[in-house]
Each structure stands twice: as structure tokens, then as C-alpha cells.
Design a protein with these regions (language model features):
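Intrinsic, low-complexity N-terminal interaction/targeting segments
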Residues: 22-34, 74
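Short, conserved beta-strand edge motifs with alternating hydrophobic and charged residues
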Residues: 19, 35, 46-48
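A short beta-turn/loop motif at secondary-structure boundaries
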Residues: 6-10, 37, 75-79
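Core segments of cupin and vicinal oxygen chelate
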Residues: 1-27
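Vicinal oxygen chelate
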Residues: 40, 46-94, 98-104, 117-130
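An amphipathic, aromatic/His-enriched active-site/gating alpha helix that lines ligand/cofactor pockets
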Residues: 106-108
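Conserved acetyl-CoA binding element of GNAT-fold acetyltransferases
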Residues: 16, 43-44
Length: 130
């Protein structure tokens, strides 16, 4: 899926979620997200957990241990993952997620706006990892 934004009346691609094409086999909504930016960088690493209970028990265990919470808990619009973002001791952003969309090649690709990238079905709006 491409993320489109308006730049002085012209639509430009801000980024793209990419997934492994396995034909009719269902795969995660995205494996990588590329963004058109002025400099090279890596935004965050994401780790899938088994279910809602694992996500929330990890959330409270990390809080209790004094780790720095960054963003969440919420549900992304694109990919529909339930998410929770944290900072590691070096300030790097880590995401725990569960229950994301599974798609096959028949789904194709969509163009979506920045509001879908930054928005949530529920939970905080904004940019994770800040």
C-alpha cells in the first residue's frame, strides 16, 4: 500500500508498505515500510506476540520493570495490528503487536492518505516512536 500526501496540489508518494507475495497464501499486511525522506534511517523494529493477553501482560511487566513506554496501546488503521511501542535503553523504538491483517495477492495494493498512516481505530493518534 502506498501512502500519498498532497504537496502544493500534487499527490506524492510518502512511503510504501510492502509484503511478501506468496500468491494465494495469506501473509502479513507488511514486512517492510519504506519512507521517502531526506536522510536514510531506521524507524523501529516490530515483534509479533501471540495474542492480546501476551501484549497486555508484556505491557504491564515492562511498566513494572521501569522501562520507558512510548506510544499505545492502540489499533493501527493500516494493517489493523493492535500495537504497543517502547524505547530500549539506547532510545531505539520497539513495537509489540498482535492480530494484524493477513492478505494474499488478490487484495492488490491501495493508495491511502497520511491520516490512515497516523490514525488509529482506537487508542492514541499520532506518530509512534517519538
Amino acid at each position: 500500500d502506498e501512502i500519498i500526501m498532497d504537496n502544493e496540489g500534487k499527490q506524492e508518494t510518502l512511503g510504501a508498505f510492502t509484503r511478501c507475495n506468496r500468491g494465494e497464501k495469506y501473509v502479513d499486511h507488511h514486512t517492510l515500510f519504506f519512507i521517502n525522506a531526506d536522510q536514510a534511517g531506521f524507524n523501529h523494529a516490530a515483534f509479533e506476540v501471540t495474542n492480546w493477553d501476551a501484549l497486555m501482560s508484556s505491557h504491564y511487566a515492562l511498566l513494572k520493570a521501569g522501562h520507558r513506554h512510548s506510544f499505545g496501546v492502540g489499533k493501527h488503521i493500516l494493517g489493523s495490528q493492535t500495537f504497543d511501542y517502547w524505547k530500549d535503553p539506547d532510545g531505539f523504538t520497539l513495537e509489540h503487536f498482535t492480530d494484524g491483517d493477513l492478505l494474499n495477492e488478490s487484495f492488490g495494493s491501495q493508495k491511502r492518505g497520511l491520516e490512515d498512516l497516523l490514525g488509529t481505530h482506537w487508542g492514541p493518534d499520532g506518530m509512534p516512536g517519538q
